[in-house]
Amino acid sequence: SMTYSSALFNSDKESLEKAQENKYYNICKNINPKPDDHLLEIGCGWGGFMEYAIKKYKVNVTGITISKAQHDFTKKRLFEAGLADRAKVVLNDYRNQRGQFDGIASIEMFEAVGEKYWPIYFSTLKNLMKTGAKSTLQIITVADELFPKYRKNVDFIQKYIFPGGMLPSKKVLEKQFLQVGLKNVNLKSFGSSYSKTLRLWHTSFNSVWDDISSVKFDDRFKRMWNFYLASCAAVFHSKTGDVIQVTLKKS
């Protein structure tokens, strides 16, 4: 599915692919789009949500990304799926996006914004929403009591995996969207699903290591990636971290 964010498991028997669809379904259920509505995805990744939303809900979706590789892959993916007439993939920074939309989705993009720019993110989000529209954001969070210490230190992930990244806590998030006048109408936590997602990624990564190493990746990368996947799975299992889908409404 080319998806690199948490799946949502409704049962232990579900496949990773089905659980990723559950995530998309829950986002669409909260945004509640009508056919021909125009949705925006901030950080469209490799196009999984765009494809799902267009197929299942007959909506039009604009996806923005700052990655040329993702832009090109997603355009090709949606064209080959016969969905190009309802899709627009734009190489753009979210702060430069114009227009207003019937709903907005953003899946684990917020973590890369940086604390300094959180107020800009939420004010931009509000400006891009039509009155009455809803946005559903999937965001990784740090436990409230750990946030003050976390924000003062650079951890392994910030140094080696996602430089410049910063996770919020739930209370910090709430303060940010209330300041711009967005109302929280739904919040779902599913950290245990992220733990399972990461464990499945870990197994899959090692099962195809011979193929990966034949490209250009060495044993140092393998150790780093295994540590990243295993340690993150432990964070969500221990509940020191969580992942949420929060739905915000513009009144």
Residue ranges and their predicted role:
Residues 1-30:
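Conserved Class I S-adenosyl-L-methionine-dependent methyltransferase catalytic core
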Residues 35-43:
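Conserved class I S-adenosyl-L-methionine
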Residues 46-57:
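Conserved SAM-binding loop of SAM-dependent methyltransferases across substrates and taxa
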Residues 74-75:
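Conserved SAM-binding loop
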Residues 95-104:
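A short acidic, Gly/Pro-enriched loop at the edge of an enzyme's catalytic core
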Residues 119-132:
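A short glycine-rich, Lys/Arg-flanked "PGG" loop and its adjoining helix->strand segment in the class I
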Residues 132-140:
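Conserved beta-strand signature within the Rossmann-like core of class I S-adenosyl-L-methionine
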Residues 141-245, 249-251:
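Substrate-binding/catalytic lobe of Class I Rossmann-like enzymes that use SAM or dcSAM, i.e.
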